[in-house]
UniProtKB/Swiss-Prot annotation:
Name of the molecule in the record: Large ribosomal subunit protein bL17
Record field: compositional bias (Low complexity): 131-144
Region feature (Disordered): 118-151
Organism: Syntrophobacter fumaroxidans (strain DSM 10017 / MPOB)
UniProt xrefs under Gene3D superfamilies: Ribosomal protein L17 (3.90.1030.10)
Gene: rplQ
GO cellular component: cytosolic large ribosomal subunit
Length: 151
């Protein structure tokens, strides 16, 4: 029984799966977006969020945990120097998955997984209010003037 067991096996051996996700999380954090299948991206999101959360902590133990997963020193440096401070005020959810159709060969659902960039949104422009119809104003103004004249 697999009660409470999280994660996806993706029909791979344990060593292959771990190596694949280590490579994928390294590529994602290095290039900030990659193109992959949807099940891989959903599992990769967990790994990437974990690495960025460790980058936000920034202590020695967190650095050693990241180095156990990400084997490239430049990427580890980027996690702690750029990504950790960038997402310091964000409590989680550092990645976005955008579906991109199906692969031609085997119809696998493909997607783009990318790191969220917190860009400032432009201020919303208020829509210009439409002027009231002219006919309605004239019709309501005429009886009021006639009533005053009759009094």
């Amino acid at each position: 029984m697999r009660h409470g067991v999280s994660g996806r096996k993706l029909n791979r051996a344990t060593s292959h799966r771990l190596a694949m996700f280590r490579n994928m999380v390294t590529s994602l954090l290095q290039h900030e977006r990659i193109f992959t299948t949807l099940p891989k991206a959903k599992e990769l999101r967990r790994w990437a969020d974990w690495m960025i959360s460790l980058g936000k902590r920034g202590d020695l133990h967190a650095r050693r945990q990241v180095m156990a997963c990400v084997r490239e020193k430049e990427t580890v440096q980027k996690i702690f120097a750029e990504l950790g401070p960038r997402y310091q005020s964000r409590p989680g959810g550092y990645t976005r998955i955008v579906k991109a159709g199906y692969r031609r060969g085997d119809a696998s659902p493909m997607c783009l997984i990318e790191l969220i960039t917190e860009a400032k949104q432009p201020p919303r422009k208020e829509k210009a209010k439409k002027p009231a119809p002219v006919q309605a104003e004239e019709a309501s103004a005429t009886p009021a003037s006639e009533e005053k004249a009759q009094d």
